[in-house]
């Protein structure tokens, strides 16, 4: 969501804009590269990329590894086989953004945080019926103002307090059924979960991480437990849109510039 303009934009569009701005700077971008190890004391990164293994050192390092989706299926309350027309949020965005495909005309959305409302809005904008949304919670995880914002695009048919549920359909999803027999029919099930920080690299490198929440232990100014290490974006915890992460990173850049002086 691009909050400053009050509209929903595709991630590739926003990333394209950022890439054009970076192209006008001296920023070196290495794609197809993975950080496999960090040495916080030496500010050293071990990289694996098309050219093989290599090491980099820096005066300051920003961890912006984002977050991954923890779905209800991982928590054990959503049972059943993953048949055709069952997808996670990343599948929904891929079908819609990259391929222009509508995965379901009558979708059932499992989950109720901001990710679920964003997926519902994308489905509605692509031409689906109003989604059915179910969750274990009695009220949606997304806050009031977040839900109010998305009412411009979607007003899901909400059902809360679902303690256990299972997928319906042998070869393709035909809906979801609760343990007490309530059915929510549909031609596609979208499983949307909360985000947990991708802090494994920091944990393995010896930086301070709270368990079991995986939250980074931060000092004022988004500084991590080792001097010269900082964090930005969704790795900080919670769910934030791309524009929030952009502004958060821009504020941090000013602090790092001061740190390097």
Predicted regions mapped to residue ranges:
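Residue-level detector of alpha-helix initiation sites
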Residues: 69, 113-115, 196, 236
């Amino acid at each position: 969501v691009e909050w400053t303009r009050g509209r929903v934009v595709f991630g590739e569009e926003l990333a394209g804009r950022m890439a054009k701005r970076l192209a006008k700077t001296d920023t070196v971008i290495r794609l197809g590269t993975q950080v496999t190890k960090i040495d916080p004391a030496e500010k050293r990164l071990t990289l694996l990329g098309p050219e093989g293994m290599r090491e980099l050192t820096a005066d300051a390092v920003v961890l912006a590894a984002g977050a991954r989706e923890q779905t209800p299926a991982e928590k054990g309350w959503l049972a059943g086989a993953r048949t055709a027309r069952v997808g996670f949020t990343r599948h929904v965005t891929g079908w819609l953004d990259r391929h222009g495909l509508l995965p379901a005309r009558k979708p059932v959305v499992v989950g109720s945080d901001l990710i679920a409302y964003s997926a519902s809005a994308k489905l509605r904008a692509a031409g689906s019926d109003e989604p059915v949304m179910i969750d274990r919670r009695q009220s949606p995880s997304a806050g009031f103002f977040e839900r109010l914002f998305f009412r411009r695009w979607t007003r899901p048919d909400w059902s809360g307090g679902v303690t256990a549920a299972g997928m319906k359909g042998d070869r393709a999803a035909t809906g979801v059924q609760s343990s007490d027999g309530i059915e929510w029919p549909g031609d596609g099930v979208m499983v949307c979960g909360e985000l947990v920080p991708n802090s494994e690299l920091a944990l393995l490198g010896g930086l301070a991480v709270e368990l079991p929440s995986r939250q980074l232990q931060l000092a004022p100014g988004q500084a991590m437990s080792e001097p010269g290490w900082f964090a930005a974006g969704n790795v900080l915890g919670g769910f934030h849109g791309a524009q929030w992460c952009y502004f958060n990173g821009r504020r941090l850049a000013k602090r790092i510039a001061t740190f390097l002086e």
